[in-house]
From Swiss-Prot:
Primary role: Regulatory subunit of lactose synthase, changes the substrate specificity of galactosyltransferase in the mammary gland making glucose a good acceptor substrate for this enzyme. This enables LS to synthesize lactose, the major carbohydrate component of milk. In other tissues, galactosyltransferase transfers galactose onto the N-acetylglucosamine of the oligosaccharide chains in glycoproteins.
Domain of life where this protein originates: Eukaryota
Mutagenesis or variant effect for R29Q: In an allele of Droughtmaster cattle; an Australian breed
PANTHER family reported in the protein's UniProt record: ALPHA-LACTALBUMIN, LYSOZYME C
Description of how the protein assembles with itself and partners: Lactose synthase (LS) is a heterodimer of a catalytic component, beta1,4-galactosyltransferase (beta4Gal-T1) and a regulatory component, alpha-lactalbumin (LA).
Location in or out of the cell: Secreted
Example of a GO MF term: calcium ion binding
Cystine bridges: C25-C139, C47-C130, C80-C96, C92-C110
This protein's UniProt keywords: Allergen, Calcium, Disulfide bond, Glycoprotein, Lactose biosynthesis, Metal-binding, Milk protein, Secreted, Signal
Entry protein name: Alpha-lactalbumin
CC terms in the record's Gene Ontology section: extracellular space
Length: 142
């Protein structure tokens, strides 16, 4: 029993050290390639990712019939492919687990496709919480 508890604790600690919890200013810097794309400002993205994933690059949210992955919570029904949804449209032509690492390059490429196809309203948090009063989402320490 003790070895099971030890193994469980090691597993939890290992997972915690792999997770990437970004700060507001880190997100601001990381998303510079999205500045103005689709008419969306950086403060809007900082706000949207905060309310979508809490700046956690390894955030996974399971819904009834789909799962959303990463900083941008990209859905496996349409945009990426995983074992849960092997018949996904996979418009971004990528495995969903690629959205769970610290390299946001592929995430941003997919986000641009989402913006081109459906716009910023794909992210419900944007319309509800991030379309005005954006001063708090600026980063002074660039």
């Amino acid at each position: 029993m003790m070895s099971f508890v030890s193994l469980l604790l090691v597993g939890i600690l290992f997972h915690a050290t792999q997770a990437e919890q970004l700060t507001k200013c880190e997100v601001f810097r990381e998303l510079k390639d999205l500045k103005g794309y689709g008419g969306v400002s950086l403060p809007e993205w900082v706000c949207t990712t905060f309310h979508t994933s809490g700046y956690d690059t390894q955030a996974i949210v399971q819904n009834n019939d789909s799962t959303e992955y990463g900083l941008f919570q990209i859905n496996n029904k349409i945009w990426c492919k995983d074992d849960q949804n092997p018949h996904s449209s996979n418009i971004c032509n990528i495995s969903c687990d690629k959205f769970l690492d610290d390299d946001l390059t592929d995430d941003i490429m997919c986000v641009k496709k989402i913006l081109d196809k459906v716009g910023i309203n794909y992210w419900l948090a944007h319309k509800a919480l991030c379309s005005e009063k954006l001063d708090q989402w600026l980063c002074e320490k660039l």
